[in-house]
Amino acid sequence: MKFVLLFGVFLVTLFSYSSAEMLDDFDQADEDELLSLIEKEEARKDCIPKHHECTNNKHGCCRGHLFKYKCQCTTVVTQSGEETERCFCGTPPHHKAAELVVGFGKKIFG
């Protein structure tokens, strides 16, 4: 009887130790995931939104629903006759077509 009792105490101790190790692993995974989300949020705050000027930072556009916006540039003639380049973050035509097809597919199939 004493052997069964000691064996039971040993199993309970072993189980509590292993579950504590698993909880520590889960806590570490949660912390890593939280840090990753915070870093992504910071990067999202630094990006340039759609339809805003990206002339000086052509690779800093934000992400859209499916794709990252692209910096699209045009040449503008000012009132004084000078040609200058103006850029804005927008969705390229082939990305618009892909988003349209995906949206249409979602309406039909899902």
From Swiss-Prot:
Q: Which InterPro entries does this one have?
A: Spider_toxin_CSTX_knottin, Spider_toxin_CSTX_Knottin_CS
What is this protein's tissue specificity according to the annotation?
A: Expressed by the venom gland.
User: Cellular component GO terms, alphabetically?
Assistant: extracellular region
UniProt signal peptide = 1-20
- The UniProt record lists the keyword Metal-binding: no
PROSITE patterns given for it?
A: SPIDER_CSTX
Where found, per UniProt? Secreted
Q: What domain comment accompanies this record?
A: The presence of a 'disulfide through disulfide knot' structurally defines this protein as a knottin.
User: Which family does the record assign?
Assistant: Belongs to the neurotoxin 19 (CSTX) family. 03 subfamily.
Question: Could you identify this protein by its name?
Answer: U1-lycotoxin-Ls1kk
